[in-house]
Amino acid sequence: MQQILTNIVLDKTLSTEGYVVVPFLEESHVNTLRDFFFENHAKDIPGFYATAHSTDIAFRKKMNDKIKAVFENSITNYFHNCLALGGSYVVKSKSQEERLHPHQDWNIVDESKHRSFNIWVPLVDLNENNGAIRVVPRSHLWVDNYRGPNIPDYLGAFNENIWQHMQTLNMKAGEALIYDHRLFHASYPNKTDELRVATVFGIIPQEAQMYYYFGDGDAVNVYESSVDFFMEGNIQKGPEVLKKVNTISAPTLTKRALPDYINFQEVKETPIEEIKQVEEKTNRLGWLKKIFR
């Protein structure tokens, strides 16, 4: 297994548990990022908002450049031989009343060879009232699957079961949740009058090729991708100018270590149309399942 973190103990925990929480930004850096956000945004933010979803590419880059500059030293200190991809502000306001359901982030590398990660850093202290993150330790080892636009979420029907078994991370401003993109995670709604402002940043091993996985009926098309595509393209619309390198016909969901509260046989036998209906009803925020969550 590739070493991701410079600290061997933390690296082992990341590998076995799927995540670690570490001190990451000094208070002055937290204030810098928070002030920069409010300097460039109105106070009223509707629902869930991410700068990476802006249609203004120059604005996306401006937000990314600031986050990257502030994160740079901490990334150098914590990560071993990794490539820093890009960052986004992710903000929850009181008007987003529903929770973000349990989910995994998209595949962006060949997970049979490499792993990919997010660095998620709140700029305010978190609790259950203002949008704290929840995780399922070791859930990154549950299944081998493909995740991306137009690819059904086969475990979506078990959202409530998964939620009941999650652990809440009441993080402090400036701490970082470093997690494997395969890890099941979710978050509470923000019930307070203050915005829950956070930042997220993608990381992959230096030698890993980026890929974009796009569902096509019963198949999954695989395209060579890049940081520029995720930063500048409209990744919801499809591969656009990317080079297709493979088509995986009728990809299977492979069980590795599912817990007892998820019936694997039921998952495999659920009709695809039923899976899509569950996604529409319970995960209207499914478009968030990307590198910049």
Question: Positions of the model-derived regions?
Answer:
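Non-heme Fe(II)-dependent double-stranded beta-helix
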Residues: M1-E111
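Non-heme Fe(II)/2-oxoglutarate
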Residues: I4, L183, Y188-R293
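Extracellular structured ligand-interaction cores
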Residues: Y19, H114-N118, N130, W163-T168, ...
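Short, solvent-exposed loop/turn segments at secondary-structure junctions
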Residues: E26-H29, V90-K92, N107, L126-E128, ...
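Generic beta-strand structural signal
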Residues: L85-G87, E98-L100, R115-V121, G131, ...
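Short, surface-exposed loop/helix-turn segments at secondary-structure junctions
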Residues: H103-Q104, D153-I162, L195, F214-V220
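Short, conserved beta-strand element in jelly-roll/cupin
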Residues: E111-E128, F201-P205
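Double-stranded beta-helix
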Residues: E128-Y188
